[in-house]
Amino acid sequence: MTDYKATLNLPDTAFPMKAGLPQREPQTLQRWDSIGLYQKLREIGKDRPKFVLHDGPPYANGNIHIGHAVNKILKDMILRSKTLAGFDAPYVPGWDCHGLPIEHKVEVTHGKNLSADRTRELCRAYASEQIEGQKSEFIRLGVLGDWSNPYLTMNFANEAGEIRALAEMVKGGFVFKGLKPVNWCFDCGSALAEAEVEYQDKKSSTIDVAFLIADEAKLAAAFGLPALGKPASIVIWTTTPWTIPANQALNVHPEFEYALVDVGDKLLVLAAELVESCLARYKLEGTVIATTTGQALELINFRHPFYDRLSPVYLADYVELGAGTGIVHSSPAYGVDDFNICKQYGLSNDDIISPVQSNGVYVESLEFFGGQFIFKANQNIIDKLVEVGSLMDTETISHSYMHCWRHKSPLIYRATAQWFVGMDKQPESGETLRKRAVKAIEDTEFVPAWGQARLHSMIANRPDWCISRQRNWGVPIPFFLHKESGDLHPRTVELMEEVAQRVEKEGIEAWFKLDASELLGDEAAKYDKISDTLDVWFDSGTTHWHVLRGSHPMGHESGPRADLYLEGSDQHRGWFHSSLLTGCMLDDHAPYRELLTHGFVVDENGRKMSKSLNNVVAPQKVNDSLGADIMRLWVSATDYSGEMAVSDQILQRSADAYRRIRNTARFLLSNLSGFNPATDILPAEEMLALDRWAVDRTLLLQRELQEHYGEYRFWNVYSKIHNFCVQELGGFYLDIIKDRQYTTAADSTARRSCQTALFHISEALVRWITPILAFTADELWQFLPGERNESVMLNTWYEGLTEMPADFEMDRAYWERIMAVKTSVNKEMENLRAAKAIGGNLQAEVTLYAEDSLIADLSKLSNELRFVLITSTASVAPLVSAPADAVVTEVAGLKLKVLKSSHAKCARCWHHREDVGVNPEHPEICGRCVDNISGAGEVRHYA
């Protein structure tokens, strides 16, 4: 038997079937570094329009987790796709370096008795070490960026830039000093930003407390009575017994109805709507003897339960009837609403009672409870209320309560002297910050769109921003306050610039070691140099100002405003939020044009990642087991607008999808063996009809993918590329062309037409997958035929694809109809193979019984119809001639019948043909193969 293998154009490529990503990817990273890929991208981008994505800085502490990986991969996919779209899209990674978590780590390692200077020194060293670790982990993900020159909030230039930004805000009239209740953590010993607060369930003691009337006549008059006749008390309900020692007022809603209830030996004032539930709680029976509005109770005085002072009634719209008594006790030092209402009624800062120290312990001078930790004092306060006869009821409830995000310990509101940015404070010029921010939100694009309403509601309802902290490791607030008046030095803005210049050279240490006389001279004795530091959200929130236009200038045609900020959904209350406020103060607009938000990563059951649940997916382990490209493919395939589910099983599905894409690429490369685009490529008009369709289909898909990339809809990109590889290529085109590719003469028009199409498809595909499968695309690029530059990233979307003419006879709709016919034929052949009626498709002879219009379509392919259907013979007949046993298909007007061929099998092309052995020199092969080996070769026109 003759071996005809040498006469076939069998596929051949060195592109490996096995990806070996965990081993190969680090080699690719080394290659990118050795060729200076990022620097080359900046060179070729000099004359391109710029696209700026400003990196939200991760905190320089610990290893990266799966959420970090998602964030960085999304950013990289966007910037790679923008580069391919013809933009200069730099990426400068950043790190958030100051703040309590790092200070806490240093204290744990080195103890709490460090000097402030030593603490800062160790914090800077620790942050630097953490950054190097995270940097290598981000690079391993395939993220292209200026990794040798990142921005760090602890860089001297950025610390100085932050001080200059603060100076601009002071100059603009946005900053003020105030006594206000702020989120306070005893473990931190500092105020916390809203973004540093999380909510957890907490068990608390609730108490109903009676405050005895002091103005009996006024209370009687308010209820329309000549006299009370019995002792009367107003009853409050609270979940914070520890605030009772600081009580200074009682709040009622002006429009609610309040009842005077006779319970036998005394009278109680309660919200009328809650009388029944309150009496049941107190195990009392009573009768309502009069009602009035909250408005009528205003300024009536009651007595504090155990201190010799009065508590007046103030009106407050925030009072609710959902629980309690309808009366709220007010401790202005420990509640934002309490504070605001008391200030409205003229309470001065000096009048506010604030007995809780920064560590959560009452001052020693507090009668009954001095020196006690507030949460431990709760029971002692309850006991005292019992002793004085004021406790009506106590219960234990579980409720959502604010906790420190770092220590997981309960927080309180605590009035302290802090520096604030005023949301509604009238600046030197223009609108208030709140109005500016609301307008800026309206001018910003949001992906997903619901982010706009979320950020709007946060801005509309947020309090003033407390920007000061009482920590060592932070950018200083370089203010000098007059010792007598407490006012800022009149040259504050000028002095801040002098400090900034020093910080630029020496870092924040320059302020802390500064002697006031160095700047103030003889005035120094009159001023205090404050030691407060800035909220870390101010650090990251001002990076747009001192990084984009300072340490990493990235201004483009519309200034140093970023085109895009991209972070997790928690950043509506974090970086998006603080950046918006600083941008509106400094530039009167948001520092971004568009905000993209991604969801949190959860497991396949929707649960958060947790070591206790053993469901943590570590990106480092994924890199080592599957490869970063698999993780990148998972990110691209997942709709990031909601929660993003991941597990080992989900990643394995991504690995399976990856193999299908890789195998398609390998098939393309293997069939480009011996193809030189410089000499072998055919013009479109010389290509076969099916090949022209394949290139046209690739062009249409490329347009769709460009649109999806532009809209950041990566899951659409993934699904369309995957479907193209599996269905339109693998399930149709590539299947059909195998016969032509393998059996026709190597340099025939039929084969070169096919290779031309494969080359164009490969050039397009390698670019399509580059933003997602960064490593694999780079590998594929090295194996493509023809001269090319060092990296696919140094190119733009492929421009060699051609569109079918509008009048092309075998147009797109035509091939859609042919695909439908082929699908029906395949379905029947699968049934026959399953029934063992035929061994393979080429054993089949198919007859298609069709309506006239479909006959016309099928007849256009002439004798090449069999190559499209991948059968040994294919014939067409009128539908009316279909035998009774013809199979009805899903295609309208089509029936078919498949028979097993009785002809011999060609040893070369495997078709069963009647002319096998007709040529005595080649008794084992068909006439077509004889012609392809030793004759002029077969001629194809369509497929």
Swiss-Prot record:
Catalytic activity: tRNA(Ile) + L-isoleucine + ATP = L-isoleucyl-tRNA(Ile) + AMP + diphosphate
Residue sites binding ATP per the record: 611
Motif ('HIGH' region): 58-68
UniProt cofactor note: Binds 1 zinc ion per subunit.
Any single GO BP term: isoleucyl-tRNA aminoacylation
Annotated binding of L-isoleucyl-5'-AMP, by residue: 567
Subcellular location per the Swiss-Prot or TrEMBL entry: Cytoplasm
Motif 'KMSKS' region: positions: 608-612
Sites where the protein binds Zn(2+): 906, 909, 926, 929
Entry keyword set: Aminoacyl-tRNA synthetase, ATP-binding, Cytoplasm, Ligase, Metal-binding, Nucleotide-binding, Protein biosynthesis, Zinc
InterPro entries: aa-tRNA-synth_I_CS, aa-tRNA-synth_Ia, Anticodon_Ile_BEm, Ile-tRNA-ligase, Ile-tRNA-ligase_type1, Ile-tRNA_ligase, M/V/L/I-tRNA-synth_anticd-bd, Rossmann-like_a/b/a_fold
Requisite cofactors: Zn(2+)
Top EC class for this record: ligase
Pfam families linked to this entry: Anticodon_1, tRNA-synt_1, zf-FPG_IleRS
Enzyme Commission number, as recorded: 6.1.1.5
Keyword Thylakoid carried by entry: no
GO CC, alphabetical: cytosol
Protein purpose: Catalyzes the attachment of isoleucine to tRNA(Ile). As IleRS can inadvertently accommodate and process structurally similar amino acids such as valine, to avoid such errors it has two additional distinct tRNA(Ile)-dependent editing activities. One activity is designated as 'pretransfer' editing and involves the hydrolysis of activated Val-AMP. The other activity is designated 'posttransfer' editing and involves deacylation of mischarged Val-tRNA(Ile).
NCBIfam families: ileS
Domain notes: IleRS has two distinct active sites: one for aminoacylation and one for editing. The misactivated valine is translocated from the active site to the editing site, which sterically excludes the correctly activated isoleucine. The single editing site contains two valyl binding pockets, one specific for each substrate (Val-AMP or Val-tRNA(Ile)).
Entry's family note: Belongs to the class-I aminoacyl-tRNA synthetase family. IleS type 1 subfamily.
HAMAP family: Ile_tRNA_synth_type1
Subunit structure: Monomer.
Official protein name in the record: Isoleucine--tRNA ligase
Organism: Pseudomonas savastanoi pv. phaseolicola (strain 1448A / Race 6)
Gene name for this UniProt entry: ileS
